[in-house]
UniProtKB/Swiss-Prot annotation:
Expressed in leaf blades. Residues 28-52 are annotated as: Disordered. It comes from the Eukaryota. Residues 1-73, 123-134, 192-201, 261-287, 353-360, 407-424 are cytoplasmic. One of its GO terms (molecular function) is calcium:proton antiporter activity. Residues 95-101, 156-170, 223-239, 309-331, 382-385, 446-450 are extracellular. One of its GO terms (biological process) is calcium ion transmembrane transport. Residues 143-178, 339-374 are annotated as: Cation selection. The chain crosses the membrane at residues 74-94, 102-122, 135-155, 171-191, 202-222, 240-260, 288-308, 332-352, 361-381, 386-406, 425-445. The gene is CAX1c. This is Vacuolar cation/proton exchanger 1c.
Amino acid sequence: MAPPESSHHHLLESGLLEVSKAPSAAVAAEEEEKKEAAAWTPSSSSSMTGRKIKSEASPLLRRLLGGPAAQLQEVLLGTKLYPLFSAVPLAVAAESLRLGRVWVFAFSLIGLAPLAERVSFLSEHIANTVGPTAGGIMNATCGNVPELIIALFALHKNKMEILKWSLLGSILSNLLLVLGSSLLFGGIVNIGKERPLDKRQADVSIGLLLLGVLCHIATLVSKYTSSTGDSINSSSVMQLSRSCAIVMLIAYFGSLMFQLKTHRQIFELEEDSSDSSSSEDDATDKSVIGFASAMVWLIGMAVVTAMLSSYVVTTIEEASESMGIPVRFISIILLPIVGNAAEHAGAIIFAFKNKIDISLGITLGSATQISMLVVPVILIVSWVNAIPMDLDFNLLETGSLAMAVITTAFTLQDDKWHYLKGLNLVFSYIVIAVCFFVMKALPTLKKEDD
């Protein structure tokens, strides 16, 4: 029989423990939310989409399906875009049966949307396995696989204009349309309020994007200011472009080192061992698909993406003539919107939840990857294969890129955001889109004048 005093003391301790659980749980939830928002860097722009869009199947169904079947269900049906996978066999059938090129192009373009989302999901899964530094590089490599593959096929078929337009369109879409929509819809949810904004990752991305714009402008200006002959001028422009590509790559990987290694504490909270929910999610994912399986699926998805990208590149001009839409408009406006639909939707959803820092990570991170990683890699590949390519994106395209980066920089210059800032970015994108649509008449007018 315990003394009354000890029993009273025991009950008092139990009550204090129960009372203390609620504040500690609230603090833990708040820290988890901050950690999720702070974990975004430009090197991991595509990972959050894959993390948030998970399989809706129950654990019981997964156990009943078994190993390979469970992986098939997880990878193909684990996204809300899974109905669009039906466009993949339709594209193959349209190509095999020699149907209209418009159908091949349309089905291929639609099929790229779920493939891009699944590639992001698989690369994020692998990145979580190999560690933060290697994972950041992995996400940087796989985050824009569709754009990279389309660019490589355009390079192989010597369609330089389509190559440059598709890459430019991805940058413009992320900076103006997606970021603008995120600020717009997130601001409407918080109408009448100014929300705080973390500028640290935005400053890094904007600095890299401005460096990329400088390289493009330098190449453009050098082509028109040189007094030497055409062949000498072309050689000088090519040398300048290749030098700039090397500088851009060094700067990009330097930014990765800055964010993932030397100054990592600035961009994300310190990891602790209390991340129980994350470890539970990881355990669930590992029980369905492991590292080796994820690599196999990633390679398979990349192969299918390459096939559809080949269809898009080979049919885009004929589809343009059939639809009466300029190739430049399709390459700059339509391709990026459809190809990155899942990633774009994720950015807007996070803005709805007042997680604008994650939206910044998605949009600015993807734009930075295209500008400072994909573009110079494509140029170096063309250099190795003796294919002439430079950083001159033409006057209108370079001007649009410069204005997009400058407009975004001014929009994010303070630590507040509201819907009007998003509205300005969206309107800027609409003006550029209309410009590329109506400019189709200029070549015809010039020929008639001659």
